[in-house]
Amino acid sequence: MILLKLYLTLAAILCQSRGTTSLDLDDLMTTNPEIQNEIINKHNDLRRTVDPPAKNMLKMSWDNTIAESAKRAALRCNQNEHTPVSGRTIGGVVCGENYFMSSNLRTWSFGIQSWFDERNYFKFGFGPTRAGVMVGHYTQVVWYKSYKMGCAINLCPNEPLKYFLVCQYCPGGNVVGRKYEPYAIGEPCAACPNNCDNGL
């Protein structure tokens, strides 16, 4: 009986440890090509699932110059306001910007999914479905014309939400007058039928 209790206790501990992931800041550095691929693939996978479907959604790709700009933004540790436009204009193009902040270290996929999940409070062509909710991160993730991006992470020890993830998107989305129509509705790839990769 004692052996059975010991076995069940050990089994419970092992199961719990499988459910938790031990992350280190170095594991999430965007200089790592595997992390770059995770970020790009997550964005493209989510862009393929927009509802209503998009006929003109471009495929995202990684850009090291944009990643350097995102790194400068992350190093500022200013979680209260976005980088000034002059600080995220690259090659004459104004880029958009998303932040994710957390007291615990989270994967890039987790942060990107949290931006996308703002769609639960978004109605295409209308905007937020209730007062006080954010949808701008979602609309930037799915902005049809944004096709280059770069991201960076930083530890901001003096902030309560000390882990700071920043992505920048070029050209930027959330254009005034079109903010709540981040793409054109239609059959995927209808606007670019000869240059399509699984809906993008």
Swiss-Prot record:
The keyword Nucleotide-binding does not apply. Expressed by the venom gland. It comes from the Eukaryota. It is found in: Secreted. Residues 41-169 form the SCP domain. One of its GO terms (molecular function) is potassium channel regulator activity. Gene3D superfamilies: CAP (3.40.33.10). One of its GO terms (cellular component) is extracellular region. Contains 8 disulfide bonds. It holds the Pfam family CAP. Blocks ryanodine receptors, and potassium channels. This is Cysteine-rich venom protein VAR8.
